[in-house]
Amino acid sequence: MSFTLTNKNVIFVAGLGGIGLDTSKELLKRDLKNLVILDRIENPAAIAELKAINPKVTVTFYPYDVTVPIAETTKLLKTIFAQLKTVDVLINGAGILDDHQIERTIAVNYTGLVNTTTAILDFWDKRKGGPGGIICNIGSVTGFNAIYQVPVYSGTKAAVVNFTSSLAKLAPITGVTAYTVNPGITRTTLVHKFNSWLDVEPQVAEKLLAHPTQPSLACAENFVKAIELNQNGAIWKLDLGTLEAIQWTKHWDSGI
């Protein structure tokens, strides 16, 4: 079911990152009503740049670290919902790539995403009288097939794909739909230099960037196309400037 972003309210977690910033710019071209950016690092210059792209869209920034307790996330969302009244889309985009930082990688890439999602269900869940909503979770192609030298990062992205697929199946109960966008290797600061697990491959970043990559702008354009296609349960691959829906192979079924 296609979805128009015109006049919609969007919360973008990590909307100032590499792919995030370019995606925010693309979103603004769609004449949103509000773009609310939640990010750990304040970047007034980037916010000013975004505001200048489309003055018709209200761009708001709140500092947010996805590793905070869920009660703090709920408190922040209360502030946002009080201001906007409705929120149509949540984009969960926080991520780090550094397999030296095991606990933080899991906390940012997976636990933080789960907690932010859980918190917004307080406002969206139709069982609580909520209107429903749309969740777009940023995964990675490493969630399909790992970069084995960074197994912690790859494992968190596989978890994001699995969690989001479950959210999509719960949509008849909650009224909240969900899908993942999974970028391939994209030229951002995230991949210029990073650490492998236990230093199993000191040159992992250099070796990765020796293979075909995509610019973040091409990824951002397909990112927004995926949002507009709005397919509950979709597992989108955004690689080498293309957008493709992955057909996931079912090897087991719980039967419930």
Swiss-Prot record:
Coiled-coil annotated residue ranges, if any: none
Reaction catalysis annotation: a primary alcohol + NAD(+) = an aldehyde + NADH + H(+); a secondary alcohol + NAD(+) = a ketone + NADH + H(+)
One GO cellular component term: cytosol
Binding locations of NAD(+): 12-41, 65, 157
Residues the record lists as binding substrate: 140
PROSITE patterns named among the record's database cross-references: ADH_SHORT
Active-site residue list: 153 (proton acceptor)
EC number: 1.1.1.1
Activation and inhibition: Inhibited by 2,2,2-trifluoroethanol and pyrazole.
Record key words, sorted: Acetylation, NAD, Oxidoreductase
GO process terms (BP): acetaldehyde metabolic process; acetyl-CoA biosynthetic process from ethanol; alcohol catabolic process; alcohol metabolic process; behavioral response to ethanol; ethanol metabolic process; NADH metabolic process
InterPro entries: ADH_Drosophila-type, NAD(P)-bd_dom_sf, Sc_DH/Rdtase_CS, SDR_fam
Effect of residue 136 to A: No decrease in activity
Class of this enzyme: oxidoreductase
Post-translational modification N-acetylserine, affected residues: 2
Pfam family membership, one: adh_short
Superkingdom as given in the UniProt entry: Eukaryota
Quaternary structure, from the entry: Homodimer.
Membership in a protein family: Belongs to the short-chain dehydrogenases/reductases (SDR) family.
Name of the featured protein: Alcohol dehydrogenase
Native source species: Drosophila melanogaster (Fruit fly)
